[in-house]
């Protein structure tokens, strides 16, 4: 029997066609001035390079709680379901929809740039009845425009982008959450480019679902997608007729790992969470008011310099330009 197994499992010749002799990686140090990824603090980079520990190690479990609490601070929320998705911001975007959209739900997407279109595409893939209200790229929505669309379409969810990466527009949020409560729908907010960079108040604005990324305003390399879900969205998820149609992003399962039970779901990207913890710690150490002011000061300096080169704002009003992404057009 042993001899037969040895014969059956005998080694085949190794195909060496793809065995290439590459040099060790040697990326240069660059100052990153695009919309993301952004430069990471040396403390964050050092944390990423630490020796991994197990994803159920008591030390890691403690760190998970610290990351959650610091995310609540950054978002200004008390939401219990606040955690970093294992994936980039697009994974967190999909998580907000996968957990709350049921087939036939009307999802109204306020589109004012590329990432509003992505929200609409994703919602449709979860068999939502997608409706859109659109503004020319570089403009933002008024409360009257949004309320008219809510009255017309009667959605289960209004989804919109806070700071639209593709245009630089930062949507004014005062009153939108109240409109959603008035018309009995959830408010889903993309904060990918705004978290850590501009004033952002999830609870005060009555936002029910939000997501972000690690590599922009938080100054951590890409790899995690912060996610937060409020009580109204949690209630909708709990009332689903069937399972969340995405096992990996199912918050009801993830909460068993990130919540008090600490039940294994998947192998978490341990070192990415090391980096996220340090990036969030540095943000809390600086303070949100100071961080927002720093971004504002740097943005105004950049705007002034670009104007001196003969460039003009793509967004017509400076007050609605996203501070960490000043988009310009040549005149």
Segments (PLM) and residue ranges:
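A glycine-/small-polar-enriched, mobile loop at the entrance of the PLP active site in fold-type I
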Residues: 29-85, 90
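Active-site C-terminal subdomain of aminotransferase-like
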Residues: 39-40, 215-304
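N-terminal glycine-rich, Lys/His-bearing helix-loop that initiates the first secondary-structure elements
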Residues: 1-51
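Conserved active-site segment immediately N-terminal to the catalytic lysine
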Residues: 203-215
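Conserved small/polar residues in nucleotide/adenosyl-binding loops
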Residues: 321-327
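Conserved beta-loop-alpha segment that forms the PLP phosphate-binding cup at the N-terminus of a helix
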Residues: 80-108, 112, 116-120
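Active-site phosphate-binding strand-loop segment of PLP-dependent enzymes
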Residues: 140-196, 209, 217
């Amino acid at each position: 029997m042993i001899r037969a197994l040895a014969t059956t499992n005998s080694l085949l010749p190794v195909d060496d066609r793809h065995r290439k002799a590459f040099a060790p990686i040697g990326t240069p140090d660059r100052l990153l001035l695009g919309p993301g990824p952004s430069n990471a603090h040396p403390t964050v980079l050092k944390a990423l390079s630490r020796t991994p520990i197990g994803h159920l190690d008591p030390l890691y479990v403690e760190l998970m709680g610290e990351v959650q609490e610091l995310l609540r601070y950054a978002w200004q929320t008390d939401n219990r379901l606040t955690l970093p998705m294992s994936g980039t911001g697009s994974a967190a975007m999909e998580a907000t929809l996968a957990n709350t959209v049921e087939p036939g739900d009307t999802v109204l997407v306020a589109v004012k740039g590329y990432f509003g279109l992505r929200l609409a595409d994703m919602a449709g893939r979860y068999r939502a009845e997608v409706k859109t209200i659109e503004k020319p790229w570089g403009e933002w929505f008024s409360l009257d425009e949004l309320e008219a669309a809510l009255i017309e379409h009667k959605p289960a969810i209004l989804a919109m982008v806070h700071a639209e990466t593709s245009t630089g527009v930062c949507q004014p949020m005062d009153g939108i959450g109240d409109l959603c409560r008035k018309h009995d729908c959830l408010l889903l907010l993309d904060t990918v480019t705004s978290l850590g960079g501009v004033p952002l108040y999830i609870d005060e604005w009555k936002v029910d679902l939000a997501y972000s990324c690690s590599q922009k305003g938080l100054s951590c390399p890409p790899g995690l997608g912060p996610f937060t879900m409020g009580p109204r969205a949690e209630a909708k998820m709990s009332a689903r007729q069937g399972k969340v149609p995405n096992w990996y992003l199912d918050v009801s399962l993830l909460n068993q790992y990130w919540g008090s039970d600490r039940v294994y779901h998947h192998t978490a990207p341990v070192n990415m969470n090391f980096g996220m913890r340090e990036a969030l710690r540095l943000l809390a150490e600086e303070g949100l008011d100071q961080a927002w002011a720093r971004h504002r000061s740097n943005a105004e300096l950049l705007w002034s310099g670009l104007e001196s080169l003969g460039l003009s704002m793509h967004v017509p009003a400076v007050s609605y330009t996203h501070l960490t992404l000043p988009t310009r057009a040549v005149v």
